[in-house]
Amino acid sequence: MSILITGASGFVGSHLVDEALQRGMEVWAAVRPSSSRRYLQDERIHFIELDFSSEERLVQQLEGQAFDYVVHAAGVTKCVHPDDFHRVNTEGTQHLVNAILKLKMPLKRFIYISTLGVFGAIREQKPFTEINEHDTPLPNTAYGKSKLEAERFLDSIGNDFPYIILRPTGIYGPREKDYFLMVKSIARHLDFAAGYSRQDITFVYILDVVQAVFLAIDRGMSGRKYFLTDGGVYQSDTFSDLIRQELGNPWCVRLKAPLWLLRIITACGELVGRKTGKPIALNNDKYNILRQRNWRCNIEPTMDELGYHPHYKLEQGVKETVKWYRENHWLSRKAAPKN
């Protein structure tokens, strides 16, 4: 069985490559010429360079290929200009799918990695309740909007295309760079949180996302959308306390900033990003993510239909993640990855 994994050099994609190889699949890793191959060293991997900005170019690059499965994990989570989200996440998906259709590739499954963020802050009334699949999405970030537009494009194709959409909450684990900023901050004695009111947060460990992808390949129903979390609901203090525990309980100053101050900081970050041409972690999208108070969602359909059972609760996942950061020297100032 052959599988094409886009975004193969990234956090999610590289873990998918690992699992596909372990399953004995013929693995094709879609990368850019500039992509790092740090986590793609296995000699069994076949590399293919794909240009998602051009449907015509994709047709040329994919001609003669015949994959059983495609997992589309390529995309961007932060950009200098909001329009770039649409160009990469929405149009890139459209171009890839249209190229596959033009080539009449006999796919068995196309798995699209979307996000819980397509729903935005739709259930902020207390007591908090779970977002469910019948709710109307109302994304409050440019990233979420671009992912929802890609979902709607897939829905518009109809039953002739065997697609399945996964909507993970915040993904963390080894090789991940965004949550790592929080780990690094706590290691340097500063724990930062946004807002004073209750915030219900959900997480999913990377290997549980990988599990869900291959369950969707094996058991998923075409056209379905599945939420992914570890099944728990947490507070921001819980996450930071677990990180501190795994770091050896360093002394730490815990700061809770009001949302108005966070708004100023992220607006400044947005301006700096546009001036330097480099995306900044604290940007307008990040403000809306941190402002949102309820990240609960219903994973029962995922469990019932796919047989998905998360193996990593937050405590174990944080333990494995911090251990990996230590072993790979990410907590060293000189060895920390660039974002």
Named regions from a protein language model:
Residues H46-E91, H95, L116, G120-A121:
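NAD(P)H-binding glycine-rich loop region in Rossmannoid oxidoreductase-like domains
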Residues I206, D241, I265-R274, K278-H309:
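Conserved C-terminal active-site "lid" loop/helix of NAD(P)H-dependent oxidoreductases
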Residues E149, E176-L181, A194-I217, G223-R224:
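Substrate-positioning beta->alpha
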Residues L138-I164:
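Active-site Tyr-X1-5-Lys
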Residues A216-L282, E315, K319-V322, S332-K338:
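Mid/C-terminal beta-alpha module of Rossmann-like enzyme folds, strongest
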Residues C297-E305, H309, K313-N339:
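Amphipathic terminal alpha-helices
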Residues H95-A142, I164:
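Conserved Rossmann-fold NAD(P)-dependent oxidoreductase catalytic core, especially the SDR/UDP-sugar
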Residues I3-R23:
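N-terminal Rossmann NAD(P)H-binding glycine-rich loop of SDR-like oxidoreductase domains
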